[in-house]
Amino acid sequence: MTEEEIFNKIADMISERFSIDRDKITKDLNFQNDLDADSIDFVELVMDLEDTFGAEIPDDDAEKLQTVGEAVEYIKSHQN
C-alpha cells in the first residue's frame, strides 16, 4: 500500500470518527491539539488503525503518534 493510500484511509477514518471535513485533514494535523482527542478517542483510533491495516500497535509506539503524518509513516514502515 502506498503512503497516499494509507493517508487516505486514515483521513477517512478521522473524518468519520471526529465529524470533521475530510479536506481539512493534513499530515500535520495533531490528534490532541487539533482534534481535541482525549485518551479514549485516541485508543479507539489506534484500534481502528489496527483493524484497518492488520497491524498491532504496541502502547509504547501508539503514545508516540502525535500527528496524522506520524501515523501514516508508522503504518507504512510496519506493513506486512
Curated annotation (Swiss-Prot):
Disulfide bridges in this chain: none
Positions of the Carrier domain: 1-79
Positions bearing O-(pantetheine 4'-phosphoryl)serine: 39
The keyword Zinc-finger appears for this protein: no
Subcellular location: Cytoplasm
Pathway(s) served: Lipid metabolism; fatty acid biosynthesis
PROSITE patterns from the UniProt entry: CARRIER
Keywords: Cytoplasm, Fatty acid biosynthesis, Fatty acid metabolism, Lipid biosynthesis, Lipid metabolism, Phosphopantetheine, Phosphoprotein
Alphabetical list of InterPro entries matching this protein: ACP, ACP-like_sf, PP-bd_ACP
Gene Ontology biological process terms in this record: lipid A biosynthetic process
Post-translational modification summary for this protein: 4'-phosphopantetheine is transferred from CoA to a specific serine of apo-ACP by AcpS. This modification is essential for activity because fatty acids are bound in thioester linkage to the sulfhydryl of the prosthetic group.
UniProt GO cellular component terms: cytosol; membrane
Record carries keyword Phosphoprotein: yes
GO MF annotations, alphabetized: acyl binding; acyl carrier activity
Pfam hit, one: PP-binding
PANTHER family: ACYL CARRIER PROTEIN, CARRIER DOMAIN-CONTAINING PROTEIN
Protein family membership: Belongs to the acyl carrier protein (ACP) family.
Protein name: Acyl carrier protein
Taxonomic source organism: Lactobacillus johnsonii (strain CNCM I-12250 / La1 / NCC 533)
This protein's encoding gene: acpP
